[in-house]
Design a protein with these regions (language model features):
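Short, glycine-biased loop/turn motifs at secondary-structure junctions and
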Residues: 1-95
Length: 95
């Protein structure tokens, strides 16, 4: 599975979600998972930041694993790597 996420800088990054990862998609487009790998940073090689926590950094080929992933399916805004299923949805997301 591939996911797309907008960073604090407004850059859409691409992540792969590995087999075996927990993925919750409550409304069909916005999802969250416990594992991801950043595979593209929109042509940027520098560090990009989370729009939620600007201390959290994204780097190319970085593996992300959320240790305190919230296992409650019905809680959309909980701990996890949040992403959209399409690039277009991520681009439209207001950071």
């Amino acid at each position: 599975m591939t996911g797309f996420k907008k960073t604090k800088e407004g850059i859409v990054i691409t992540a792969t979600i590995p087999a075996g990862a927990i993925v919750f998609c409550i409304n069909g487009s916005k999802c969250r998972t416990n594992k991801a790998r950043i595979i593209d940073m929109g042509g940027h090689n520098e560090v990009l930041h989370s729009s939620y926590d600007d201390k959290f950094e994204y780097r190319l080929m970085q593996d992300i694993e959320i240790e305190d992933f919230n296992l409650l399916y019905s809680v959309e805004c909980a701990s996890g790597f949040h992403f959209f299923r399409t690039r277009e949805e991520a681009e439209k997301y207001n950071v």
